UniProtKB/Swiss-Prot annotation:
It comes from Baumannia cicadellinicola subsp. Homalodisca coagulata. GO terms for molecular function: translation elongation factor activity. Its main location: cytoplasm. HAMAP family: EF_Ts. This is Elongation factor Ts. It comes from the Bacteria. Associates with the EF-Tu.GDP complex and induces the exchange of GDP to GTP. It remains bound to the aminoacyl-tRNA.EF-Tu.GTP complex up to the GTP hydrolysis stage on the ribosome. PROSITE patterns: EF_TS_1, EF_TS_2. The keyword Glycosyltransferase does not apply. Pfam families: EF_TS (PF00889).
Length: 280
């Protein structure tokens, strides 16, 4: 048997752009024959998938699923390159397969779910002719989990106490989170470094007005109140009834929000690609 050296694996990787482990496996199966290994990779569709793997996937769908007692939920983002494929039944079925497996097996690791579905992903890439990427996965546990989806583009999981008698309101709160994009439950949850960074920015902006120091201080304080309100769920105006804060609505019904997760298709992808480009 021919020794599968690092040099040989690198040569196959350079020629095919397939993953290192796939290259090594292909070479072992081909007994070190690099041309045969390439043919086998092509037959299995893995070269096609590898060649497409560098293409940006900014389209896709969000999927959510909750278990039978509504105490555990999963949310995933599955990406493709075009809106056309995102609406394709085969693509959506692939997503359903992933999230159902993640829920049933309580998988929260992105690497684990990717590894589990890599062969099916490669087959799908070959079928639709686009790069496909399981971008992220998250899970939520609690007394009661509510989910909300907006056109498969935005998904929310919400964990709350005392909400079993007000599931409709729970759905409305989840819908509010989808629309208004809060980052934290309440102001006290905002990390101090976030507050400090924003304060420096607003102070710098206000100082350019050349107004008296007292006025500048008032301007900054006002902008900071607005900033914290905009990213804190309980301090936002309720989208269904803007005359009331979300916190007021929840207090009236004695509902306590414990946690929430919000995914939107493609968010931060440009920043991620920029980071990858700088790293390469």
């Amino acid at each position: 048997m021919v020794a599968i050296t690092t040099t040989l694996v690198k040569q196959l990787r350079d020629r095919t752009n397939a993953g290192l482990m796939k290259c090594k496996k292909a070479l072992i199966e081909a007994n070190g024959d690099i041309e045969l290994a390439i043919d086998n990779l092509r037959k299995s569709g893995q070269i096609t998938a590898a060649n497409k793997s560098s293409r940006i996937t900014a389209q896709g769908i969000i999927l959510t699923k909750i278990n039978h007692n509504s105490q555990y939920g999963v949310i995933i983002e599955l990406n493709c390159e075009t809106d056309f494929v995102a609406k394709d039944k085969i693509f959506k079925n692939f997503g359903e397969d992933i999230i159902t497996t993640a829920l049933n097996q309580k998988i929260s690791s992105l690497e684990e779910i990717k590894s589990l579905f890599e062969e099916k992903r490669i087959t799908l890439v070959d079928t639709v002719g686009e790069n496909i990427n399981i971008r992220r996965i998250n899970t939520l546990e609690g007394n009661l989990i509510v989910s909300y989806l907006h056109d498969t583009r935005i998904g929310v999981l919400l964990s709350a106490n005392n909400i079993s008698q007000n599931l409709y309101l729970g759905k409305q709160i989840a819908m509010h989170i989808a629309a208004m994009k809060p980052k934290y439950i309440q102001v006290n949850d905002i990390p101090s470094y976030i507050i400090s960074r924003e304060h420096k920015i607003q102070l710098n902006i206000a100082m350019q007005s050349n107004k008296p120091q007292k006025v500048i201080q008032q301007i900054v304080e006002g902008r900071m109140r607005e900033f914290t309100r905009d990213i804190s769920l309980l301090d936002q105006n309720f989208i269904i009834d803007p005359s009331q804060k979300v916190g007021q609505i929840l207090e009236h019904y004695n509902i306590i929000v414990k946690n929430f997760i919000r995914f939107e298709v493609g968010e931060w992808i440009e920043q991620e690609e920029h980071y990858k480009a700088n790293e390469s």
